Amino acid sequence: MKSKNLLLVLSSLFLVGCGGRGETETPTEKPAEGVKDGVRVAYGLTGGNLTRAEINVKDGKVAAAHFGEFQVGASVLATANVAEASDAVFTIAGKYGNSYVAKYLNFNGDVYAGTLDAEGKTVTFKKGDTDLNAKIGALTAQDELASLYHTLENNFIYGSDAEGNDLGLTKQLNKASADSKYWPTKEGVLGWKGNTAKIEAALVGKDLSKDTVDKTASGATTGSFQTYIDLATKAFKGESLATVHYSRDMIEGREKNGHSMCFAQIELHFGADKKIKKAFINETDQFMTLAAKLTDEEAALFTDDEKLTVSTTVYAKNLSVAGELFTGSVLETAYQKEALGFSNAAVTAAKFTNSLDYFGSTLELAQSYYHAAMLHNINKVKADGTVVAPGTRGNRTATKAEKDNGYWNITDGSKDTVNNSRWKWNIAKVETALIGLDLSADIAATQGDDKIWSFGTVSTGASMTEAETFLALAKVAFSYLA
């Protein structure tokens, strides 16, 4: 990621978090020529697996690495559980028992019909003459692969009826998600998460423009080791022309920061001319107060000392964020719309009295919180860290771009929406308006009398205040372009 000097300069121009950033560090050695600091991503489609490598580069070396991955075969995307078996699914007999595949697959709004072969073994999905597996396999451009990845991550591919209505069947999970059971880690077996953790650790400190990463030394056992290394190298060098930035959704010093309790991700894909080809924006749904909220059933699992009550709402007193324990207290006055304040002396230190400011203080911490939320690594726990219930909504959503997330939903037809969500509608407008922009130019966000925001001369069509924020975040992401 970019040096703290650059980060401080950029934050003075637009934004980036809300707390102090600590001491400025001086690189101990000259960064590799041509390798720019920043956070970059790269995608690859190999053997029916869509992989995303996110690489933080600082002082010319890998500072952190994060991998995500989905299976993307059409039949896998349409897989249902035995408990979901009905007239809406095919039953396929196999060596280890029956498996179930939805008869229709809604692929981001397009409905593909499944056909079971004569042997009753294979389902082929088509829309007209378009075979879904062939369509997926033909994707090669980074922005195309990214679009598929984010569509999967946000649950817009699902088993449906012939009209495309969601049947509530199993949805494909990111292998990095806490909910994923793909190749589980167990005694003597690293599994997918264990292997990628080894690879991520082995990448740290490497200058991938010249250093090699040894599989044996890494401790990883996966046969796909080199695939991950090659993808990480592509992101490191900036060959993918794709960057990503994380931050609290706010602009420093602005009077109105209505989403300042949310953490945003903005991923940009560029053409050779460095103009934006595609943008993907998402943000977490509020902060720890929402994550700590207990259902009646969950509340019964905690003692009175392990709960907090505000008015008639009951919350877990303790939350685990990516394994770190945070303890809450009721605030006399809500802070950034948060009724509870959470802290952990070991990680927040005396400098931060509230974990919202802590996670908002650096790009790296905002990044870690966003990933914890998206991958369901935030949990309601006992004081000793024992997990009692997940810290996501009952429908397992944690971010606003996800299909079933209910943030700013309008269902009465009174306004234009995307998936009944005014937030998704506004964000789609902002993402579209960013396409074609050259952020090396001095482009300002301005709001007209009709409340619609423009980026320079481009009208976004969006009215949400945060449109201005996302242009500021896009400028930071642009600065990471190698």
Give residue ranges: language-model regions.
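Positively charged n-region of N-terminal signal peptides that target proteins for export
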Residues: 1-5
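Non-catalytic terminal and connector segments of soluble metabolic enzymes
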Residues: 31-32
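Bacterial lipoprotein signal-peptidase II cleavage site
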Residues: 19-27
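Active-site- and interface-proximal helix/loop "cap" or "latch" segments in soluble metabolic
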Residues: 35-37, 43-248, 253-482
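C-terminal motif of bacterial Sec signal peptides marking the signal peptidase cleavage site
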Residues: 15-17
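Sec-dependent N-terminal signal peptides
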Residues: 6-13
